[in-house]
Amino acid sequence: MDQPGDTTHFGFRDVPLGDKQTLVNGVFHNVAQRYDLMNDLMSAGLHRVWKDATITALNPPRNDTPFALLDVAGGTGDIAFRAAKAAGLGFRATVCDINPDMLAVGHERAIKQHLDHQVSFVEGNAETLAFADRSFDAYTIAFGIRNVPRIDSALREAFRVLKPGGRFLCLEFSTVDVPGLDKIYDLFSFKVIPPLGRAVTGDADSYQYLVESIRKFPKPNAFADMIRDAGFARVTWQVLSGGIVALHSGWRL
């Protein structure tokens, strides 16, 4: 239970724990309309490769077997759409996001891609999911967990809503582990991304927060321990693109 005076980080700032969600909501309200474009620009398109790797790991059934995916912090629908296109007719995805602006963009994209019969959008909080116990075959979260104020609560909720045998997959920015690349990555992150955000979205501060939040996120081994503590078994991870991102996996057995 939260205590008076409890704090957490919002980028490099310490803020009251209860304030972080409101601050994060403001970030994504400001950038929702250009979020997908900025992902392409910031990563030179690599985010598409990383998300495709997530879907390869997910490996949804290609036949009519029913398969229910919960994509949390899925906003504009990238993961859910990729999974739907890779899966068979029994696939259904629920995109859950706390930000209605992101969900609105995602719903419009689903209609344009003729995927609205397979992908639905629900406003909700990762820490208190409004879904029944053991109701999903898989849970994905891509570039969202670091924005959650209470990560341990979100992980416990992920475990709760998964069926036995269900899989948890988390794609998140990580720690660059290639000498030389780390300095280039830091320079690009702090000197290029915020001005780029200002030029494309009119908002540099939101992207300053996003690059700072990456540096505050636990290293892969520490995050793996958090996943285990939530009850998951067979926890593994792989780093991609020299450690720019990590893909964590766990199972509810």
Curated annotation (Swiss-Prot):
Which EC class does it fall in?
transferase
Positions with a binding annotation for S-adenosyl-L-methionine: 76, 97, 125-126
Keywords associated with the record: Menaquinone biosynthesis, Methyltransferase, S-adenosyl-L-methionine, Transferase, Ubiquinone biosynthesis
Q: Which PANTHER family match?
A: 2-METHOXY-6-POLYPRENYL-1,4-BENZOQUINOL METHYLASE, MITOCHONDRIAL, METHYLTRANSFERASE
Q: What is the lineage of its organism?
A: Bacteria, Pseudomonadati, Pseudomonadota, Alphaproteobacteria, Hyphomicrobiales
> What's the gene?
ubiE
Record keyword Transferase present: yes
Q: What InterPro entries does this protein map onto? A: SAM-dependent_MTases_sf, UbiE/COQ5_MeTrFase, UbiE/COQ5_MeTrFase_CS
Q: Which domain of life is it from?
A: Bacteria
Family matches, as Pfam families: Ubie_methyltran
Q: What does this protein do?
A: Methyltransferase required for the conversion of demethylmenaquinol (DMKH2) to menaquinol (MKH2) and the conversion of 2-polyprenyl-6-methoxy-1,4-benzoquinol (DDMQH2) to 2-polyprenyl-3-methyl-6-methoxy-1,4-benzoquinol (DMQH2).
- Pathway it acts in? Quinol/quinone metabolism; menaquinone biosynthesis; menaquinol from 1,4-dihydroxy-2-naphthoate: step 2/2; Cofactor biosynthesis; ubiquinone biosynthesis
User: Which EC number(s) are documented for this chain?
Assistant: 2.1.1.163, 2.1.1.201
Recorded catalytic reaction(s): these are: a 2-demethylmenaquinol + S-adenosyl-L-methionine = a menaquinol + S-adenosyl-L-homocysteine + H(+); a 2-methoxy-6-(all-trans-polyprenyl)benzene-1,4-diol + S-adenosyl-L-methionine = a 5-methoxy-2-methyl-3-(all-trans-polyprenyl)benzene-1,4-diol + S-adenosyl-L-homocysteine + H(+)
Gene Ontology molecular function: 2-methoxy-6-polyprenyl-1,4-benzoquinol methyltransferase activity; demethylmenaquinone methyltransferase activity
Provide the family line. Belongs to the class I-like SAM-binding methyltransferase superfamily. MenG/UbiE family.
Protein's recorded name: Ubiquinone/menaquinone biosynthesis C-methyltransferase UbiE
GO biological process: any one?
A: aerobic respiration
